[in-house]
Every structure is written in C-alpha cells, then in structure tokens.
C-alpha cells in the first residue's frame, strides 16, 4: 500500500447529517484569522475536492478541518466544508465537531457537563455538552448572532410564479418559504422535489433579492432554502417541521441549526417568539434540534437575537483517505446523476 497523501478522519453525524472531522494529515491553511483560512480553502479547492468529491466523498457529506485556534481563549477551531460552500458557521457541523472532540478524547471530558469555546470561521461559539459514561449525549451551541433581513418579500421564480419569502441569517444565509403554501407536508417522500425546487428558489433569490451581512462583506449570497412548517404551540414550547435544500440539490437530514436560528430570528422580528422561548425543529427523518432565544443584540444596525441550538451527535467510524501516486483523479470527480437534484 502506497500513498502520497493520507488524511485522518473521524466520521460523525448530528441528528442524521454527516459531518466528518479531519484530525490529522492536513497542515493549517494560510491566513491571519480562521475566516481568512476558510477563504483560502474555498478558493484553492484542493482539500475540498479531495474529501468531498467521489470516490472519497459525495454530495451527502460535509467535512470539517480542525485547526489551531487564533483566539487565545478558544479550545479548538474548525473550518466547515459543505458540498458547494465554505460557510461562516454550521449547527450540525458544530455538534459533530464537539462530539468528536469529546468522545474522541481530543478535549478532556468532564461529567456531567463539559464547557468549550470553539472558534468557527464566523466567530466564537460557546459549547456546553451534557456528558455521561464517557459520551457527550447532548450538545448545546450558542450560535452566532442571527437576524431577519427581509420579511414578506416578493420573489418571482420561473415555473412557480410569485412567492412570498422571508430572508434571514443564522450563521448562514437563508431564503425561507412556507412549506404548506408550496404544497409540502414535509414527509420523507417529498425530499427530491424539495431539493429540486429549493435550489431554484435559492438561485432566484440570489439574482433578485441579494443578501448582505452588515459585518462580513465577503458573505453576499444565499446558501439555502428553508421550507418552514407551521409553528405549533405545545406544553414543551414551539414546534415546527423543517426541510432545508442545500446546493447543489439535496435535503439536510438534520433540522439544520443555522436554519433554526434564522427562523427564530424571523419569528422574533414578527413578535411571534419571545426571549427565553424554545422552538423544536423536526427534520424529514424525524430528528430534532431545539433552539432557544437567549437574548437580543444588534449586527451592524440590524436587530438580532442570540440563539442557542441543541442536538445529538454520534461517531460512526475512523477513516484514512489516501492518494496513490498513479491515481488519475487526485481531486476526485462529480457527475450530475448524484450531484444535484433535477
């Protein structure tokens, strides 16, 4: 067995969404900040292609690179690589990273709770993990400040006509549509159509509405479309279905932590969710994330919330991705039969 490159990975998922973690074999990319390092990875694409493309990856996989933190108080830092984006933050990936750090013994576990400060490309996030018998059983992440951008905006989508949408930021950027109004009951068998239409809606929103982050001029696009289910009030708090279409055309298996944060920001802006209340989002496979509004703040001149999200993660395996020098596809390949719903 020979290899000119060996990347060491601990595989994990958070409530169904794959979020592998690179723990060795890759040196930190250049950059004075974690954000600058993530921009290098996005531009260079060598590592992204190696781990995300076939034959090592696929459209179903996200991969996180552990790097030394830049902030002196941070316990660890990570860069998120999604199928088409290298985003500021990800809820499911932060849960996967936290699970790997603790269950993998990289950060010492304290029972019944372990507290960590992680540095994501978009900023610092506080993590609290409920731990028992050597397992991080539930991860709580204080996400980046989240805000509603546009409410009840009109969006023309070819073949769908005029839609009423909200746009928001929850650590990543979303266009949000009413699932019921689009004819969806958020069942597993609707996944392909949700993915297909979601990408069309996202692309239309990028052309017609645009997105800008008041404090991050590099982030100027919508990444995802959230199909938002009806909010119900229960004894345990608010509850709603959620399905997020991810570029180039797949549905998140988890409820998507950044989407949950974005939706809470929209509900708060409408006066439909208060500080201290919780919203449980339910994915197409029935998994859940629970969000809570911890407080309020501003992002630039925009009112924002301080969201907390929580969910569970599990390690699924350990892998060594290798590259034989005779392999004619050192960065892999992708084909449209799987790379994008059509």
Swiss-Prot record:
GO terms for molecular function: 4-hydroxyproline epimerase activity; trans-L-3-hydroxyproline dehydratase activity. InterPro entries: Pro_racemase_fam (IPR008794). Induction: Is up-regulated when the bacterium is grown on t4LHyp or t3LHyp as sole carbon source. Keywords: Isomerase, Lyase. Pfam families: Pro_racemase. It catalyses: trans-3-hydroxy-L-proline = 1-pyrroline-2-carboxylate + H2O; trans-4-hydroxy-L-proline = cis-4-hydroxy-D-proline. Disulfide bonds: none annotated. It comes from the Bacteria. Its EC number is 4.2.1.77, 5.1.1.8. Substrate binds at residues 91-92, 252, 257-258. The active site is at 90 (proton acceptor). Belongs to the proline racemase family. PANTHER family: BIFUNCTIONAL TRANS-3-HYDROXY-L-PROLINE DEHYDRATASE_2-EPIMERASE, TRANS-3-HYDROXY-L-PROLINE DEHYDRATASE. Catalyzes the dehydration of trans-3-hydroxy-L-proline (t3LHyp) to Delta(1)-pyrroline-2-carboxylate (Pyr2C). Can also catalyze the epimerization of trans-4-hydroxy-L-proline (t4LHyp) to cis-4-hydroxy-D-proline (c4DHyp), albeit with 30-fold lower efficiency. Is likely involved in both degradation pathways that convert t3LHyp to L-proline and t4LHyp to alpha-ketoglutarate, which would allow A.tumefaciens to grow on t3LHyp or t4LHyp as a sole carbon source. Displays no proline racemase activity. This is Trans-3-hydroxy-L-proline dehydratase. It comes from Agrobacterium fabrum (strain C58 / ATCC 33970).
């Amino acid at each position: 067995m020979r290899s000119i490159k060996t990347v060491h990975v601990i595989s994990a998922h958070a409530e169904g969404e794959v979020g592998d973690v690179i723990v060795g074999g890759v040196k930190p990319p250049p950059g004075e900040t974690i954000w600058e390092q993530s921009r290098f990875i996005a531009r260079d694409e060598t590592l992204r292609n190696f781990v995300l493309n076939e034959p090592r990856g696929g459209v179903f996989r996200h991969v996180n690179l552990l790097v030394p933190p830049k902030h002196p108080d941070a316990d660890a830092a990570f860069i998120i690589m999604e199928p088409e984006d290298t985003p500021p933050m990800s809820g499911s990936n932060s849960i996967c990273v936290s699970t790997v750090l603790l269950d993998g013994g990289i950060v010492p576990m304290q029972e019944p709770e372990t507290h960590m400060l992680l540095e994501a490309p978009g900023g610092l996030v506080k993590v609290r993990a409920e731990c028992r018998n050597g397992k991080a059983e539930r991860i709580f992440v204080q996400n980046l400040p989240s805000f509603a951008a546009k409410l009840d905006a009109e969006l023309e989508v070819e073949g769908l006509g005029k839609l009423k949408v909200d746009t928001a930021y929850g650590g990543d950027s979303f266009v949000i549509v009413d699932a019921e109004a689009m004819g969806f009951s958020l069942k597993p068998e609707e996944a392909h159509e949700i993915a297909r239409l979601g990408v069309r809606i996202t692309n239309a929103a990028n052309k017609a509405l645009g997105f800008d982050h008041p404090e991050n001029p590099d982030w100027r696009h919508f990444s995802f479309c959230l199909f938002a289910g009806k909010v119900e009030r229960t004894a345990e708090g608010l509850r709603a279905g959620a399905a997020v279409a991810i570029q180039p055309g797949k549905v998140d298996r988890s409820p998507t932590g950044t989407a949950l944060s974005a939706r809470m920001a929209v509900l708060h802006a409408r006066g439909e969710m208060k500080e201290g209340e919780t919203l449980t989002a339910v994915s197409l496979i029935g998994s859940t994330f629970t969000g809570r509004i911890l407080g309020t703040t501003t992002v630039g001149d925009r009112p924002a919330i301080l969201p907390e999200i929580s969910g569970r993660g599990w390690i699924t395996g350990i892998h060594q991705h290798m590259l034989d020098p005779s392999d004619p596809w050192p960065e892999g390949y992708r084909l449209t039969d799987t790379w994008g719903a059509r």
